[in-house]
Amino acid sequence: MDLTGKQVLVAGLGKSGIAAGALLKKMGCMVCLFDGNEKFDRSAWKKTYPVFSDCPLWIGELPDAAVQEMELAVVSPGIPLDTPAILKLQAVGVPVVGEAELAYRFEKGRVAAITGTNGKTTTTTLVGEILKKCYPEVFVVGNIGIPYTSIVEKTTEQTVTVTEISSFQLETMETFHPSVSAILNITPDHLDRHHTMEAYIRAKESITKCQTKEDTC
């Protein structure tokens, strides 16, 4: 995936957004930044992350003029897709993907993905430890607290990446294709975001949408 010279918006400047932005800069993108929190301390944040000192940063509201200039938007999982900024981007045809989807597009190895309402972190950690006994290079990432984009450059054809995937992350997956996936359980959760249990279930089940008969779920 060649993003050199592309103008890319990173929406949400927490851990995932920072990692995604850093990867995009390394890939030669023109990175722009947005956070909807009107209390966001622009000055302090840029001092903490000087790598983004030359990046335009919008707080609270995303200007229409900026929306028109974007060629891709990378959204942190904590940002609902029905927020005004995301709806603006989609309305003018800007592709919107999540941080994990962005990372996967640069993945060189195989992926094992785990989702579910409860037990994701424990299972992901355990699977990672087991695979480390069998494979020379294993990364454990995702909703477990380590952004996928922070390690994906290190992957090789010999790598196995074990990733914990939340329903929020699955909402913005397009090409994500794990060799092995697991849905642990599904009980009512995050209905303030998904609105209905049916939508929540669909989000979880979408972990398999790019899998084929050669894969395992």
Where are these regions (language model features)?
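Phosphate-binding loop of NTP-binding sites
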Residues: 22-26, 65-68, 77-217
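N-terminal leader/targeting and accessory segments in enzymes
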Residues: 1-98, 102
